[in-house]
Amino acid sequence: MQAPNIYPFSQTQPQALPGFTYGPPQLVFDHSAPRVDPLHSTVTINSPLPLQHYNGPNAHINSANNNYAYYYHHPNNNDNNNHSNNTIKNNNINSVLPAVNIQISNNSHYRNTHQIPSAPQRLVSIIPDPHMPPNISHFQLNNIHPQMHAPVATDIHFQQVPVYNKTNNGIGTDNINNDKPVNSNQNEVLDNIDERSCHEINRVVSFSKHFENNELTTTANDLNIQSTMDELAKLKSLSNSTHFRQSIATQNFHSLQNHITTIENRLASLLTDRQQEQQQLKQQESEKESSSPFSNKIKLPSLQELTDSISTQHLPTFYDNKRHASDTDLKSSTLHGPLYHRHAFLSTSSSSPSPTAGSAPLQKLQVPRQDDPNDKKMNISSSPFNSITYIPNTTLSPMVQTQLKNLTTSNLNTKKKNNRGRPRAIQRQPTLTTSSHFINNSNPGAAAVSTTTPAANSDEKNPNAKKIIEFCFHCGETETPEWRKGPYGTRTLCNACGLFYRKVTKKFGSKSSNLLLRYRRSIDLANDRRIPDFITIPNRFIHDMDNDQTLDSEYNTILQ
């Protein structure tokens, strides 16, 4: 794996600038600035070298106030000595700052050391660290930026500092306990900070342990809370580290304290959300337990209750499954339920014996319908089986059941066939002059067909029955072998007028094409000459009959 190019300038050999002299190659070791290996995820700290390694006026380096970041290149390990001597000779540099010849072995702590490309052996720049305030150590846990480092000898001690804000990397207890102390002067401020940090971390860890013992804590499946617990545990292990205790500063403690507060708030919010979820689950379970099926809410009456209700019932009523039921029937059916009608039928069948009760099957019995003079919505198509009451809990033989089923289906089919050829009842009479003329001038006996609804048990006619008018919308004919479709719907024209009815597509109005309806008059009367033989009705007017638009104004507009 090739090391990434993170150097501050290109790898090519730069040209010598006029008026600029190259200094001798030097190895710069900063005591406090961290060195981050690009191929590793841990941070390494260089220990201070003995003073004999530094020559010249730069020999005395104050490590406490050294707040500069040194950017340099890796020297070539193969020809370190020769290259340094040649550089001094070629550049004609004053030997005030001689190069330090440090034998660096090939067995370095870093991987891929020999794959790093060679670069000019000179000190590039010494600039202040923009991320740190003055007179503060460079070591910051929350703000570590990768910087380049030089390979050093194997006998130089390195310390690995655990990164507390990375939850994925585990921290071994052996590395923490085996840290070698660094020779540095500790003051009382660092001791106080160390005690405060340990106190805060212990408080947060105890807070997390309190929630671990609680029932509201999540299991190992909840990754968010589990990772927060691990992060707090790593904070406590970091506080016990010897190197962390000796290298922490005031600003670092404030950042650590803020981070602990953030983790504590996050843990509290996660646990609160978990508590709310469990409360919702408990509430849903309680609602499910309280809500029972519909059959459990309605208690079915017992046999004794049925007997008592049968003996105390009033006059019997029955269901009428006609399409147009009377108001009294609707009121009685809504006031009493189906169970009431079944009880009423049981009482009538048991109290009044009939000759057909023994021969007819028990599951389907006909109740004689009583004539009501106020019923104005009776229909001819009412069959003798319109009023049927089914007795529950009766078992019949399969042969009887099939016969009853076939009888019911045959009655329904015949009723549909009878209604197919009959025209619809006119609910809204049109405003055409033709239809109004024939309604007013035609014979009432021929134009108006009065139909009555006879009772099931008597042959007397009801004079208050509804009269249905059947006529052609075009010619007013009331008798025709077949009713045909017209502009006002199905079965609105007689057979003669419907034969001349046709649809054409013709341009009308602002639209490019509209469907126009055209039909021809079959009867031409002397008193109705103003209407031509052909009348064109736009389709949009026909479909808007339910709106406020009247057809008289539209006809006048078309005919003029």
Curated annotation (Swiss-Prot):
Biased composition regions of type Basic residues, renumbered to the chain: 414-425
Chain intervals for the UniProt region annotation (Disordered): 274-297, 345-383, 412-461
Key word DNA-binding present: yes
Gene name of this polypeptide: GAT2
Keyword entries, A-Z: DNA-binding, Metal-binding, Zinc, Zinc-finger
MF terms (GO), sorted A to Z: DNA-binding transcription factor activity, RNA polymerase II-specific; transcription cis-regulatory region binding; zinc ion binding
Residue spans, zinc finger GATA-type: 472-497
Compositionally biased spans, kind Basic and acidic residues: 369-378
CDD domains cross-referenced by the UniProt entry: ZnF_GATA (cd00202)
Protein name according to UniProt: Protein GAT2
Biased composition (Polar residues): 428-456
GO terms for cellular component: nucleus
Biased composition range(s): Low complexity: 347-361
Listed GO biological process terms: regulation of transcription by RNA polymerase II
Cross-referenced SMART domains: ZnF_GATA
Gene3D superfamilies: Erythroid Transcription Factor GATA-1, subunit A (3.30.50.10)
